[in-house]
A protein has these predicted regions:
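Catalytic-site signature of metal-activated, phosphate-bearing donor transferases
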Residues: 60-63, 69-70, 81-187
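Acidic helix N-cap motif at the loop->helix transition within catalytic regions
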Residues: 10-13, 34-43, 83-84
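Short acidic donor-binding/metal-coordinating loop in glycosyltransferase active sites
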Residues: 30, 50-52, 68, 75-78, ...
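Short, well-formed alpha-helical segments that are part of the catalytic scaffolds
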Residues: 3-21
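Conserved donor nucleotide-binding strand/loop of the catalytic core
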Residues: 37-65
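A conserved acidic beta->alpha catalytic loop
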Residues: 18, 29-39, 75
């Protein structure tokens, strides 16, 4: 599994606990000052430090640091549910078939309430893929997405997404995200 972090000490334990079935967990941290790196190491993750150059670049870096060809990429505010874990393990045990990647339904929780309606669910995200056939591509610096060359299947089970810590956290993102979008070059 591959995770990028910056000051995620309050969330990293639950994320890593949900990945206990993975053969390897790599965390790339971009300068946390809250004990994130230490918590991740205590959970058995291999932790690397890398200066932040953008979300996509950071995710490419962690994928390239993995030792296995198949990688599961999560953000620190995400958790693999038991149903998703079972689905991933079934595919892994079957050799992943002819697929290059797998999507899962991400279920966002908004201050503890799951968003099952509207455009929020299912947010089908490609998070498990063969890194030889894909990665974090495109020119988007926020809401970046992985893509692969080859067939993509859908996994059963949800990826739990604990989007915001608090209302001030959400407001800070509403300030940050448009600036990042404005700085993203467009083709």
């Amino acid at each position: 599994a591959c995770i990028i972090t910056l000051n995620e000490a309050d969330r990293i334990d639950a994320c890593l606990d949900s990945l206990a079935f993975c053969d390897e967990i790599v965390v790339v941290d971009s300068g946390s000052s809250d004990g994130t790196r230490e918590r991740a190491m205590a959970k058995g993750a291999r932790v690397l430090e890398h200066a932040f150059e953008g979300y996509r670049a950071q995710k490419d870096f962690v994928v390239n640091a993995a030792q296995h060809d198949w990688v599961l990429c999560l953000d620190a505010d995400e958790r693999v549910t038991p149903a998703l874990r079972a689905s991933i393990e079934r595919e892994r045990d079957g050799g992943f078939g002819h697929h290059a990647g797998y999507r899962c339904a991400r279920l966002t929780e908004y201050f503890g309430a799951p968003l099952h309606h509207g455009n929020a669910y299912p947010d089908r995200v490609l998070r498990l893929f063969d890194r030889r056939r894909g990665g974090w591509r495109g020119n988007r610096e926020i809401h970046e997405h992985a893509s692969v060359d080859g067939a993509v299947a859908m996994l059963a089970g949800d990826l739990d997404h604990q989007a915001y810590r608090s209302l001030p956290d959400q407001l800070a993102r509403l300030d940050r995200d448009p600036r990042l979008l404005a700085e993203t070059p467009h083709a």
